[in-house]
Structure formats: C-alpha cells, structure tokens
C-alpha cells in the first residue's frame, strides 16, 4: 500500500470494499438459484462478475482502480488524468492526458518533435516499464481494465496491443521464423497451427505473394518496405486488438510508404490502429481521428476532417499551417 493516502481516498476505499462484499454475496446467491436451470450463458456471466468483484475486494492499493465502471465500449482505450515523468521526475513528458481512442478506427497522433507523441503511444502497452527513472500517475484503461492492474497481466496486454516501430525490426532469422518465434514464445507449439498462422499473417500484411517461395531465407534480404510489412505480420500473428505504429513509414521511400498506407486501410477493418506521424498529408490520408499534442498535453482531439479544416485551437491551426513545429 502507498505510504501517503488522503483520508477521503481511504474512506471511499473502505466504503467500496463493503459494497463489493455485498455484491459478491448477492451474485453467489443468484448463482445458486441458476444452478438448477439450464441457463449456462447467464451462469458464465455471473461467474465473470463474481471473479471481477473478488479482484476489486482483494485490492490492497486504494489508489489503483482496476476497472472503470463508466467505460465507453466504443473506445479501445480510455486515458484518465495520465502524467509521465522521465529521469526521476526531472522531465514532465505527459501532462494531464484525458483521451478516448475509438475501436476499429485509425487515430493519428500529430505535433512538434518532443511533444510527447511517442511517449504516449509507448505508454499504451507499458513499454516504459523497461526504462529506469520513469514515474507516472493517472490511469490507462484497455476495454475497461487498468493496464497496470493484475486483472490484465503484462504478457496478455502485449499480445493484445501490438507494436510497429519507426525502423523495420526483423530478427536475424528466416522470414518464417520471424513470425514463428513470436508464436512459440507465447506457447504455441503445434507446427501445423504455426504454419497456418504464418501464412495468414503474411497475407494480412500483404507480403505472402512476395515471400511464399523464400520463406526460409534471411529476413534481412528483404527491402525496407518488405521488412516493415514483415514487422506488421509479426505483430498481427498474435491476433491483437490494437496496432500501435510509431512513424512506421519515416524510413521508407514513397512507393513503400504508399503500400504501408494501403495496408493500414485494410487492417483497420480488423484492428484499432494508433499511428504517430510527422506527415500532415499522411495523417489526412490514413486516419479517421487526429489528436494534436503540444508540450506534453493534448490540445485538441477530433475527426481528422475537423482537425485539418476547422481546428478549434489556434496552436493546432498554426502547426497544421507550418507556423510552429
């Protein structure tokens, strides 16, 4: 438990524990009544609710909210009052972020260099856990679950939230093993199943036709654009719900960039996509929604059409028009 807990938080915490205890009793009684019926679907729902309330009841940290009760399930992520510091609080990188990211949409993050875009996108799958001196406050919810709660283990989060980096990151393995390795590391051992997922993932990344005859050759023999599509194939192999893309085309030529952008349009049918881009033209081409970051804050969030044609914030307009950068 944190050392400093204000009395109001502690009082609310104890009140909630009492409510959760009563809710568990009520659900257990309802479960007993349902056991004599054939309503298996309702029993499954009741068991899930009991499990959830037991987690809430056992929570020993009053400052950690495991679930968000009023979560809007049109969103894949909801971020509440999120702050992040680097270098033992020497640098305040993200400031009071409140944001909802919609499901099955492409959301572009734009803003000047150093404004917090990449810091933010890496927060969504806990990549900052690997960085010394990082501290944070506030909450990030993924489908109502706090990503820092034990209700959502880190490995599960990483499998549901895939990441594609600025530069292609093929392993020093064959094209096939680049994808198979990720599957094996997540416990998939059956070769027939692995073969199937490798093929499906390469098809999903529009790469299968390019590599089907050279699957066991080194991935480093692929072009930059092909390597980036391989990175995407590796990310979607685990069947995530979200793809995070941190400037995925900045190291590619215009032809390869165009292929990735076309692929993004296809991928959004199955995945929610968050993309960091410095290209205003790219943001307009690929995204449904746009978020403008400035000096660690979200200054504006709206549909891409609204942000680029009728921005509400003067700084958003100045950035889009090239007056600040």
Swiss-Prot record:
CDD domains: ABC_PstB_phosphate_transporter. SMART domains: AAA. It is a peripheral membrane protein. It comes from the Bacteria. Keywords: ATP-binding, Cell membrane, Membrane, Nucleotide-binding, Phosphate transport, Translocase, Transport. One of its GO terms (biological process) is phosphate ion transmembrane transport. GO terms for molecular function: ATP binding; ATP hydrolysis activity; ATPase-coupled phosphate ion transmembrane transporter activity. The keyword Transmembrane does not apply. ATP binds at residues 111-118. It holds the Pfam family ABC_tran. InterPro entries: AAA+_ATPase, ABC_transporter-like_ATP-bd, ABC_transporter-like_CS, P-loop_NTPase, PstB-like. The complex is composed of two ATP-binding proteins (PstB), two transmembrane proteins (PstC and PstA) and a solute-binding protein (PstS). PANTHER family: ABC TRANSPORTER I FAMILY MEMBER 17. Belongs to the ABC transporter superfamily. Phosphate importer (TC 3.A.1.7) family. This is Phosphate import ATP-binding protein PstB. The gene is pstB.
């Amino acid at each position: 438990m944190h050392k400093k807990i204000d009395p109001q938080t502690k009082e609310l915490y104890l009140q909630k524990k009492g409510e959760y205890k009563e809710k568990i009793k009520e659900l257990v009684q309802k479960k007993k009544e349902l056991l004599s019926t054939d309503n298996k679907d309702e029993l499954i729902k009741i068991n899930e609710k009991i499990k959830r309330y037991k987690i809430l009841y056992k929570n020993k940290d009053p400052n950690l909210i495991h679930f968000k009760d009023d979560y809007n399930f049109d969103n894949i992520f909801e971020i509440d009052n999120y702050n992040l510091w680097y270098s033992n609080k020497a640098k305040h990188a993200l400031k009071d972020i409140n944001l909802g990211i919609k499901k099955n949409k492409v959301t572009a993050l734009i803003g000047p260099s150093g404004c917090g875009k990449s810091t933010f996108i890496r927060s969504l799958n806990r990549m900052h856990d690997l960085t010394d001196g990082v501290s944070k406050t506030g909450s990030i919810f993924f489908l109502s679950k706090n990503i820092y709660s034990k209700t959502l283990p880190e490995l599960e989060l990483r499998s549901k939230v895939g990441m594609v980096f600025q530069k292609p990151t093929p392993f020093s393995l064959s094209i096939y093993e680049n994808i198979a390795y990720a599957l094996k590391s997540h416990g998939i051992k059956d070769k027939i199943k692995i073969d199937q997922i490798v093929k499906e993932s390469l098809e999903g990344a529009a790469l299968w036709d390019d590599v089907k005859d050279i699957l066991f050759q080194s991935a480093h023999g692929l072009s930059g654009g092909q390597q980036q599509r391989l990175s995407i194939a590796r990310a979607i192999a685990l069947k995530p719900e979200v793809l995070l893309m941190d400037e995925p085309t900045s190291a590619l030529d215009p032809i390869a960039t165009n292929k990735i952008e076309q692929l993004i349009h296809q991928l959004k049918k199955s995945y929610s996509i968050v993309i960091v881009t410095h290209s205003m033209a790219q943001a307009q081409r690929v995204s449904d929604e746009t978020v403008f970051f400035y000096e660690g804050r979200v200054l504006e969030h709206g549909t891409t059409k609204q942000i680029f044609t009728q921005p509400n914030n003067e700084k958003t307009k100045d950035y889009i028009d090239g007056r600040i950068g």
